[in-house]
């Protein structure tokens, strides 16, 4: 993450305040300590996790859902990916729930099976529908106030585009909602419309495209999903 930030110091849409401090001014952050222990990256970078329960941990975890053969390993690595910065229990839970939903979706689990597992394992209420949330939802950058709503947008969708439209129109932290919803929807529907894919990859820095190509080659992602963009064939 530090390498990406150094190459792209101001991400499209910007980075969160605490994350910017973690990246560029790590000494200003208080090292948050809990039962998980220290991040494995602290000793070499001088950066410490800062106890965040923010939805950034869930927003960035999607790739973890594609790398591993078992749900247990997926959840374990999702926790590690979150704890580098977001080592609050809610931050870790949000990342694990998102990665678990993606793993289940790519392995052909039904929406109801995904709903039941996430509710039972992570305690999120997924029975409130998109129609319930749309008129009442507002800004919330916590995992506990974002991940359930994002999963709900997926559960109530008919295809990938519909899932994204629901997430964006819900309001609040809509880019994060769409990241979480879209990661699950792509794994489930296994296709992204060409028009959407072209607009997404167009502004990417070259390093992002190199990483995407590597992920396609090294995981089942490349043979499972149809990315409807000319660059991907």
Where are the predicted features?
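Structured, active/binding-site neighborhoods that engage oxygen-rich ligands
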Residues: 1-233
């Amino acid at each position: 993450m530090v390498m990406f930030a150094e190459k792209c110091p101001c991400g499209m849409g910007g980075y969160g305040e605490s994350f910017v401090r973690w990246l560029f001014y790590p000494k200003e952050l208080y090292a948050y300590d809990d039962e998980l222990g220290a991040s494995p990256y602290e000793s070499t970078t001088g950066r410490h996790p800062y106890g965040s329960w923010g939805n950034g941990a869930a927003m960035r975890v999607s790739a973890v859902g594609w790398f591993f053969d078992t749900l247990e390993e997926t959840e374990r690595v999702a926790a590690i990916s979150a704890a580098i910065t977001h080592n609050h229990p809610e931050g870790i839970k949000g990342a694990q729930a998102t990665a678990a939903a993606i793993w289940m979706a790519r392995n052909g689990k039904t929406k109801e099976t995904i709903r039941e597992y996430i509710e039972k394992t992570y305690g999120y209420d997924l029975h409130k529908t998109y129609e319930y949330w749309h008129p009442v939802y507002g800004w919330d950058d916590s995992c506990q106030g974002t991940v359930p709503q994002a999963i709900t947008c997926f559960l109530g969708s008919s295809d990938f585009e519909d899932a994204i439209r629901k997430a964006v129109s819900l309001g609040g932290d809509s880019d994060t909602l769409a990241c979480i919803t879209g990661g699950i929807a792509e794994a489930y529907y296994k296709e992204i419309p060409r028009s959407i894919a072209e607009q997404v990859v167009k502004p990417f820095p070259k390093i992002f495209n190199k990483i995407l190509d590597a992920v396609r080659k090294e995981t089942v992602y490349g043979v499972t999903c149809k990315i409807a963009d000319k660059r991907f064939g």
